[in-house]
């Protein structure tokens, strides 16, 4: 398939846009708890110091130095750090991050930049994925643009976590999977793809355990649509590479306490969800049908950029009923227009939506977009109906499976566990590339079958993109509770600032004194649920000290917030007050 001379420049502009959005304010807001875990684990350091007993848990020893903190770690130390700080998840990501830090150091910008790279690579991969499997460059460019501005991808590309890597690897694995299916259908025996697919399955599972839902979708597709004996034989052998790697990790590596840890967490969250009173109501709730529906419906709608945030803004039963009625009438009018080509029906669409716009008591543009979503759904179904190629129809089904199965899996597990804690968009983010393709197909179908109504649909979609841009703004300003987990922006990471100030002021004979701040959420962590002394603040500061420094340091269990430099003459200088949770993100 040949590309026009404009394709590559447009693609590069999209990548540049994505890069700009993902690097904007990249280190303005300090790394939060999970990101701190990423850094510590990548260095073989368990949160709360179990792999650093020489510093924190040697009987009779009350002081330590950065040199001791940075002492060489064994392979078992790395395993223990992962099992204690991330329930054994993501070893492949930590290997990459470890080597990345060896080259670029520990700075908020550099550790997050790794995720930016994988996020931008995912956009580039999506282009080739669509070009290969849909033979449509316009579709590929539109989908890449939508991925570039998708708030979910922007938010998680700015985290030093495994998500961007996992999204890239699962899309690549899906790409290779479809190439295998295509080769088998064309009787091409290319065994190398099976090896690549198997290795990718291992990388995916060891990047995030829930990437298994993507391979579950692959298996369901084979079960429903593939009737090639050779593939049925070789694909399980290929996946056994990932299975063996995962099995080894769970049995003999840092994942050997994963399932006990998950079981412990499930019990704790269940108890909290069913407690009376429930102090975590709205965050951890019993898995009743109303609670699960309330929490899962926004996850499903936010998968599609056309309905992003729509449930947060469309409130009121009267408005919703009116929007549903207008949607039905709009779909009917569209059907009549396509049958008769009478401009009267265009007028009906414009008239009823204009009337609705006047009658909606709130969120007028969002209700217009709700109607638009219904029309776009019809156009996607029309695209499906007009797809005559059997292989392409199978891929249409595959898109739907991949778009919904990961979230459906979360819903099932939510009912199984009895609480809603794990029902989160980030755990089903593998679906986004495919939901983006679905939206792009529907939008392009309007240009084929709905002129001049397509201009109206695109116009309303552009209004939706304006609201998406507002969401992006809150993400980049660190004020999106949905994507940043907070609505009040963090300041710059205080721990490097503390380390820099201490390096300037420390003199031989001085002692650095750290606070001990014990968090109640540790109850969900099987390793630290009974902790009496926290060494986290000391760990975070020492990450930014020279590895050979010999500053004398200790921890004051009675002090919760203040980092103190105690001079050799007894003078105490307050370096920083962490103020409870205010600066401990």
Model-derived segments and spans:
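N-terminal signal-anchor/signal peptide hydrophobic helix marking the start
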Residues: 8-11
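Glycine-aromatic-enriched surface loops/turns that form tight recognition elements
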Residues: 459-462
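Short, Lys/Arg-rich, polar N-terminal cytosolic tail immediately upstream
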Residues: 1-5
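Membrane-proximal helix-loop-helix interfaces that form the catalytic/acceptor-binding platform
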Residues: 14-125, 129-133, 138-140, 145-149, ...
């Amino acid at each position: 398939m040949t590309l026009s001379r404009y394709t590559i420049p447009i693609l590069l502009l999209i990548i540049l846009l994505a890069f700009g959005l993902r690097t904007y304010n990249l280190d303005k807001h300090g790394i939060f708890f999970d990101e701190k875990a990423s850094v510590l684990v990548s260095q073989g350091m368990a949160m709360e110091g179990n792999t650093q007993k020489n510093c924190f848990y040697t009987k009779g020893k009350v002081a330590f130095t950065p040199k001791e903190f940075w002492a060489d770690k064994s392979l078992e130390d790395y395993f223990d750090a992962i099992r204690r700080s991330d329930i054994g998840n993501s070893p492949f990501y930590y290997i990459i991050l470890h080597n990345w830090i060896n080259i670029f150091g520990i700075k908020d910008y550099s550790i997050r930049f790794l995720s930016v790279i994988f996020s931008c690579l995912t956009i580039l991969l999506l282009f080739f994925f669509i070009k290969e499997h849909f033979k449509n460059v316009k579709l590929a460019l539109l989908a890449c643009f939508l991925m570039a501005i998708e708030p979910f991808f922007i938010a998680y590309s700015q985290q030093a976590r495994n998500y961007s890597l996992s999204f890239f690897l699962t899309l690549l694995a899906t790409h290779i999977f479809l190439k295998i299916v295509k080769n088998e259908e064309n009787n091409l025996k290319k065994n190398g793809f099976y090896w690549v697919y198997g290795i990718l399955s291992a990388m995916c599972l060891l990047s995030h355990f829930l990437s298994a839902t993507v391979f579950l979708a692959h298996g369901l597709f084979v079960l429903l649509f593939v009737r090639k004996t050779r593939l049925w034989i070789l694909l399980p052998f290929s996946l056994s590479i990932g299975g063996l790697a995962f099995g080894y990790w769970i049995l003999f590596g840092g994942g050997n306490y994963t399932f006990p840890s998950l079981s412990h967490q499930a019990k704790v969250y269940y108890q909290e969800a069913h407690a009376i009173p429930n102090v975590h109501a709205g965050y951890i709730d019993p898995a009743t049908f109303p609670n699960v529906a309330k929490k899962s419906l926004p996850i499903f709608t936010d998968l599609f950029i056309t309905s992003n945030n729509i449930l947060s803004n469309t409130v009121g039963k009267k408005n919703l009923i009116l929007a549903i009625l207008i949607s039905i009438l709009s779909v009917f009018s569209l059907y009549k227009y396509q049958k008769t080509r009478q401009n009267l029906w265009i007028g009906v669409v414009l008239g009823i939506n204009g009337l609705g716009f006047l009658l909606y008591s709130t969120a007028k543009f969002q209700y217009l977009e709700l109607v638009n979503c219904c029309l776009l759904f019809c156009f996607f179904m029309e695209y499906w109906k007009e797809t005559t190629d059997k292989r392409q129809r199978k891929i249409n089904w595959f898109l739907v499976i991949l778009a919904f199965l990961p979230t459906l899996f979360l819903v099932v597990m939510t009912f199984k566990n009895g609480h809603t804690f794990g029902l989160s968009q980030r755990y089903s983010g593998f679906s986004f590339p495919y939901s983006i393709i679905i939206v792009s197909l529907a939008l392009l179908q309007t240009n084929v079958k709905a002129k001049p109504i397509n201009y109206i649909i695109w116009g309303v979609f552009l209004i939706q993109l304006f609201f998406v841009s507002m969401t992006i703004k809150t993400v980049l300003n660190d004020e999106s509770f949905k994507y940043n987990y907070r609505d009040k922006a963090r300041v710059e990471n205080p721990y490097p600032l503390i380390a820099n100030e201490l390096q300037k002021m420390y003199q031989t004979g001085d002692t650095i004194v750290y606070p001990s701040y014990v968090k109640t959420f540790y109850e969900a962590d099987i390793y630290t649920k009974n902790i009496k002394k926290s060494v986290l603040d000391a760990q975070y500061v020492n990450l930014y000290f020279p590895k050979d420094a010999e500053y004398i340091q200790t921890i004051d269990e009675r002090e919760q917030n203040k980092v103190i430099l105690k001079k050799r003459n007894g003078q105490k200088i307050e370096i920083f007050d962490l103020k409870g949770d205010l600066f401990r993100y």
